């Protein structure tokens, strides 16, 4: 069953996605639910499909994805990163094209922690001169 299955791990913010890719007709299953059912927003679905549209393989593979942590945007970004890595395992010649689009690089931005004495990470209490 697992013949010619490709794997990629993607991360974004606090989300982690495990992406399993095998030959098929373009079905994307996320946490045992269809992509249109899992992501209500069209923008999140577009983010997930970006690397596939770039290399024109939207209808060539089926994806079985498990994603944990974070919110909708972070999970979509993690899935995109995982799909990109799985595509590179499948065909290393796609790396240049994917890198040029910016999909290979892990987005290292995370939420900055709240500091003691401040309201948020950087928001300071109101200053009174007198």
Swiss-Prot record:
It comes from the Bacteria. The keyword Ribosomal protein applies. InterPro entries: Ribosomal_Su5_D2-typ_SF (IPR020568), Ribosomal_uS9 (IPR000754), Ribosomal_uS9_bac/plastid (IPR023035), Ribosomal_uS9_CS (IPR020574), Ribsml_uS5_D2-typ_fold_subgr (IPR014721). One of its GO terms (molecular function) is structural constituent of ribosome. Signal peptide: none annotated. Keywords: Ribonucleoprotein, Ribosomal protein. One of its GO terms (biological process) is translation. The keyword Ribosomal protein applies. PROSITE patterns: RIBOSOMAL_S9. Disulfide bonds: none annotated. GO terms for cellular component: cytosolic small ribosomal subunit. It holds the Pfam family Ribosomal_S9. NCBIfam families: PRK00132.1. Belongs to the universal ribosomal protein uS9 family. This is Small ribosomal subunit protein uS9. The lineage of its organism: Bacteria, Pseudomonadati, Pseudomonadota, Gammaproteobacteria, Alteromonadales.
């Amino acid at each position: 069953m697992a013949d010619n299955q490709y794997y990629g791990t993607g991360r974004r913010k606090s989300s982690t996605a495990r992406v399993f890719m095998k030959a098929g007709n373009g079905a994307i299953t996320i946490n045992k639910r269809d992509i249109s059912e899992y992501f209500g927003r069209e923008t999140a679905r577009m983010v997930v499909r970006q690397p596939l549209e770039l290399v024109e393989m939207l209808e060539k593979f089926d994806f079985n994805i498990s994603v944990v942590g974070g919110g909708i945007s972070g999970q979509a970004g993690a899935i995109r990163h995982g799909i990109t890595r799985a595509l590179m395992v499948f065909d290393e010649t796609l790396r240049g094209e994917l890198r040029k689009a910016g999909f290979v690089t892990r987005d290292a931005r995370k939420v900055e922690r709240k500091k003691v004495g401040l309201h948020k990470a950087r928001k300071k209490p109101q200053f009174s001169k007198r």
